[in-house]
Amino acid sequence: MGSQVNDVEEVVQAWYMDDDDNAEEDQRLPHRRQPDDLLPLAKLLDLGLVAMRLDADNHEHDENLKIMREQRGYLHMDIVELTPEKMPNYEVMIKRFFEEHLHTDEEVRYCLDGSGYFDVRDENDKWVRVSVRKGALIVVPAGIYHRFTLDTNNYIKTMRLFSGGPDWTAYNRPHDHLPERKKYLEALHNRTPRFGQLHRIRSKME
């Protein structure tokens, strides 16, 4: 299991963000605390996230991706690129993505190229920044407050996976009354074990 975690940590890293809420600060900077200790992947799993590494160069024929999609019921997908060259309203859009929100379904993103940051709230409402690079697949659970931004490379190509028709509705904070939010908080407070879930997925893929 240790080697699997190390493989994932090459493309997924996480740390607590600094407390600088200055609107003038570039959201695309790392915003690490000092000292900038990395968090173990188990912390992400405790928060309900799933992180794994797949072969991005072979995504069209990757049996591991196929198995993972079958196991989790991801029947549909599309591929999007975020970059100033392909989005005339790029700066407006990344500001919109950076607004704190939640979804009523899990958000699944597979980084095929480039890089970016997912920020998620921990159990004490602190921001955890999750860096994803090529090969990283991350599942953000329904009901968790989060946001997304590109980093200073200003480019990411992602596969979006979903089980039903795509519903990108974002509920900006506060939306604590939603059932999905209540279910997430219940699972978080009960410390529902998730590391085993990741292990089962990976063991069936190998």
Swiss-Prot record:
Annotated GO biological process: L-methionine salvage from methylthioadenosine; methionine metabolic process
Cofactor(s) this protein cannot do without: Fe(2+); Ni(2+)
Co-factor note (free text): Binds either 1 Fe or Ni cation per monomer. Iron-binding promotes an acireductone dioxygenase reaction producing 2-keto-4-methylthiobutyrate, while nickel-binding promotes an acireductone dioxygenase reaction producing 3-(methylsulfanyl)propanoate.
Binding-site list for Fe(2+): 101, 103, 107, 146
InterPro entries associated with the record: ARD (IPR004313), ARD_euk (IPR027496), RmlC-like_jellyroll (IPR014710), RmlC_Cupin_sf (IPR011051)
Keyword annotations from UniProtKB, A to Z: Amino-acid biosynthesis, Cytoplasm, Dioxygenase, Iron, Metal-binding, Methionine biosynthesis, Nickel, Nucleus, Oxidoreductase
CC annotations in GO: cytoplasm; nucleus
Binding site for Ni(2+): 101, 103, 107, 146
Domain of life: Eukaryota
Gene3D superfamilies tied to this protein: Jelly Rolls
One Pfam family this sequence matches: ARD
Example of a GO MF term: nickel cation binding
Functional pathway: Amino-acid biosynthesis; L-methionine biosynthesis via salvage pathway; L-methionine from S-methyl-5-thio-alpha-D-ribose 1-phosphate: step 5/6
Compartments where located: Cytoplasm; Nucleus
Reactions listed under catalytic activity: 1,2-dihydroxy-5-(methylsulfanyl)pent-1-en-3-one + O2 = 4-methylsulfanyl-2-oxobutanoate + formate + 2 H(+); 1,2-dihydroxy-5-(methylsulfanyl)pent-1-en-3-one + O2 = 3-(methylsulfanyl)propanoate + CO + formate + 2 H(+)
Entry EC no(s): 1.13.11.54, 1.13.11.53
Functional summary from the UniProt entry: Catalyzes 2 different reactions between oxygen and the acireductone 1,2-dihydroxy-3-keto-5-methylthiopentene (DHK-MTPene) depending upon the metal bound in the active site. Fe-containing acireductone dioxygenase (Fe-ARD) produces formate and 2-keto-4-methylthiobutyrate (KMTB), the alpha-ketoacid precursor of methionine in the methionine recycle pathway. Ni-containing acireductone dioxygenase (Ni-ARD) produces methylthiopropionate, carbon monoxide and formate, and does not lie on the methionine recycle pathway.
UniProt record similarity statement: Belongs to the acireductone dioxygenase (ARD) family.
Protein name according to UniProt: Acireductone dioxygenase 3
Gene behind the chain: ARD3
